[in-house]
Amino acid sequence: MAFLKKSLFLVFFLGFVSLSICEEEKRETDEKENEQEDDREERSEEKRLLGMIPVAITAISALSKLG
């Protein structure tokens, strides 16, 4: 009976360790994906702002011609 208890404990322990490792890897993968998504959002915001520069220059030049 003691052998069976030790065997079950060993199986439980190894399963728990394996599960912990898998969860850690999943967490790291999710963090990397979130960082990549944040980088994409920042680049798209920069592109929008850079796209507004010609419009702003046109508006300023039009206002300077009026004044």
UniProtKB/Swiss-Prot annotation:
The modification Leucine amide is found at L66. In the synthetic mutant medusin-PT1a [T58K], the Leu-50 has been modified in a D-amino acid. In medusin-PT1a, there is an increase in antimicrobial activity, and an increase in hemolytic activity. It is more potent against S.aureus and gains activity against MRSA, E.faecalis, E.coli, P.aeruginosa and C.albicans. There is an important increase in both biofilm inhibition and biofilm eradication. Expressed by the skin glands. It is found in: Secreted; Target cell membrane. Residues 25-46 are annotated as: Disordered. Its main location: secreted. Residues 1-22 form the signal peptide. One of its GO terms (cellular component) is other organism cell membrane. The keyword Ion transport does not apply. Residues 31-40 have a biased composition (Acidic residues). Residues 23-48 form a propeptide. GO terms for biological process: defense response to bacterium; defense response to fungus; innate immune response; killing of cells of another organism. Keywords: Amidation, Amphibian defense peptide, Antibiotic, Antimicrobial, Cleavage on pair of basic residues, Fungicide, Immunity, Innate immunity, Membrane, Secreted, Signal, Target cell membrane, Target membrane. The primary structure of this peptide is identical to that of Medusin-TR1 (AC C0HLE1). Antimicrobial peptide with activity against Gram-positive bacteria S.epidermidis ATCC 12228 (MIC=50 uM) and S.aureus (MIC=64 ug/ml and MBC=128 ug/ml). Not active against some Gram-positive bacteria (methicillin-resistant S.aureus (MRSA), E.faecalis), Gram-negative bacterium E.coli ATCC 25922 and fungus C.albicans at concentrations up to 100 uM. Can only slightly inhibit the formation of biofilm by S.aureus (minimal biofilm inhibitionconcentration MBIC=512 ug/ml, minimal biofilm eradication concentration MBEC>512 ug/ml). Belongs to the frog skin active peptide (FSAP) family. Medusin subfamily. This is Medusin-PT. It comes from Phyllomedusa tarsius. The lineage of its organism: Eukaryota, Metazoa, Chordata, Craniata, Vertebrata.
